[in-house]
Amino acid sequence: MTDLVSLSPKPASAPGTRPAAARKVYVHTFGCQMNASDSDRMIELLGRHAFARAETPDDADLILLNTCAVREKAEQKLLSALGRYREVKARRGALIAVSGCVAQQEKDRLLARVPYVDFVFGPDNIGKLPEMVARAERERFAETGWMDSQDYVFPQADPEAARGRPTAFVTAMKGCDNVCAFCIVPHTRGREVSRAFPEIVAECASLAEVGVREVTLIGQNVNSYAGGCTFAELLRRVAAVPGIARIRFTTSHPHDLSDALVAVFRDEPKVMPHFHLPVQSGSDAVLARMRRDYTVAEYLDRFDRLRAARPGIAITTDFIVGFPGEGEADFEGSLALLERARFEQSFSFLFSPRPKTVANLRLGTAPEWQEIPRAVAVERLERLQAAQRRIAAAALAAELGKVVEVLVEGASDEPGERLGRTPENRVVHLAADEAGAPTGALVRARITRAGGSSLSGTPA
């Protein structure tokens, strides 16, 4: 299925504006872990076609901006970044490309509004990137068509690109079949397509062979995975891969959290005691307008079953504040839920109306869809975040004096320290050198300090 926009041929570049030797690509990634994984795939793909990775945009011959459209602010960040890269294009003759969800949603507007963008492409077109780069030397265009589900080919990771890194993302699926009223993802990522489980397991095995210890399975809604087995079964298969010590995944929809998945947390120690389970609101009325397909009580039932199956599990969540029609009582419900659940962390944002979504189309059409004044929404968000900071600080303080396992990910920004994470995904600054805590090692650490968002410790 093709969705192609082509503009007039480009004028020839001035002599000497782009070197003939091996070129460099700089990737600026916005948004989610799926985007981070896509960026890795794009760098690997271009690496097979004589592109090296540029550490700064000033050294790049191709600048790729991999975008997020979940909130309007992300689009504003894109336009700001494009303005900064315009000078690099003028000086080096660099190509500028926009990929990801904003590219999928706003292809025509981007090409018209930003004349120095050379090409635009959606998430389903990553595999064509080398051909698109060559074509962009001749003309400006957008390629944002969807691949049919049966024809979709997941980009293959190059395990060598992960050598020396202890962690890696592994794509399990893409797209989303839910129709949450606030969410643009089904319009920018398409329908759900699951990757066949043997392919996922094989990639995890190849990553383990080059030293990866932890894999994170990613998708817009991994709980609905259907690649030849259930998601719970997939986790058990990955856990059987020699060399893989830790398994994480994201993101999940509470409606699809099965008893079988809860059982995996109970039975499989390689599946880390950390679960991101977005709730969005503590009000049944707001959840219904959001089309989330669960009530607060149903969410808490799943939450409690996870806690019972894996005592000590760190559960994180998302909140949207200021959704249309949210009253003070609705917001108080979110605060009450936060206090009841004691989430390890929550990612909370103001409601951002997105094109084509139900919430955007219904905004202002009825009393229950009235827009919340920004000042009211901002004040509520500040209250929610203050409560979350207090709860998170208490959770970190409770770790003082404990001996925990830390996967060392590399050097810290502070001299004489290494950086790693606990099974619960808590960041630990470890007072050790490379010899005492090499990258990829699982070390025991005694926690000596709890900060606002991280821990400090010494080898135990």
Curated annotation (Swiss-Prot):
GO terms for molecular function: 4 iron, 4 sulfur cluster binding; metal ion binding; N6-isopentenyladenosine methylthiotransferase activity. InterPro entries: Elp3/MiaA/NifB-like_rSAM (IPR006638), Methylthiotransferase (IPR005839), Methylthiotransferase_N (IPR013848), Methylthiotransferase_N_sf (IPR038135), MiaB_methiolase (IPR006463), rSAM (IPR007197), rSAM_horseshoe (IPR023404), TRAM_dom (IPR002792). [4Fe-4S] cluster 1 binds at C32, C68, C101. [4Fe-4S] cluster 2 binds at C176, C180, C183. Residues 23-138 form the MTTase N-terminal domain. It comes from the Bacteria. Gene3D superfamilies: Methylthiotransferase, N-terminal domain (3.40.50.12160), tm_1862 like domain (3.80.30.20). It is found in: Cytoplasm. Its main location: cytoplasm. Residues 397-460 form the TRAM domain. One of its GO terms (cellular component) is cytosol. Its cofactor is [4Fe-4S] cluster. Belongs to the methylthiotransferase family. MiaB subfamily. This is tRNA-2-methylthio-N(6)-dimethylallyladenosine synthase. The gene is miaB.
